[in-house]
Curated annotation (Swiss-Prot):
GO cellular component: cytosolic small ribosomal subunit
Function: One of the primary rRNA binding proteins, it binds specifically to the 5'-end of 16S ribosomal RNA.
Top-rank taxon: Bacteria
UniProt KW keywords: Ribonucleoprotein, Ribosomal protein, RNA-binding, rRNA-binding
Family: Belongs to the universal ribosomal protein uS17 family.
Protein name: Small ribosomal subunit protein uS17
PROSITE patterns xrefs: RIBOSOMAL_S17 (PS00056)
Molecular function, one GO term: structural constituent of ribosome
A single BP term in Gene Ontology: translation
Subunit organization: Part of the 30S ribosomal subunit.
Entry keyword annotation includes Ribosomal protein: yes
Length: 84
């Protein structure tokens, strides 16, 4: 059974030094359970970039895929904004 609704995330490319791999930083806002204050929580994930089209600073959309390597479980869907 294939899962239809795959997770999609939007983030900023922080590294493109690896071959066909980019590192994307995801920033989310989460509310503290006791103080009810919003905090910025960030995480970095490695994503597969088959055509190597994204560069550092680009805003990209990534999607969850099957494991490609030890660390890669995401793939680039599209580049939303290019860095000027």
């Amino acid at each position: 059974m294939a899962r239809e609704n795959k997770k999609e995330l939007i983030g900023k490319v922080v590294s493109d030094k690896m071959s066909k791999t980019i590192v994307v930083e995801i920033v989310q806002r989460k509310m503290h359970p006791i103080y009810h204050k919003y905090l910025k929580v960030s995480k970095k994930v490695k994503a597969h970039d088959e055509k190597e089209v994204s560069k550092v600073g680009d805003k990209v959309k990534i999607i969850e895929v099957r494991p490609i390597s030890k660390d890669k479980r995401w793939a680039l869907v599209e580049v939303l904004e290019k860095l000027k």
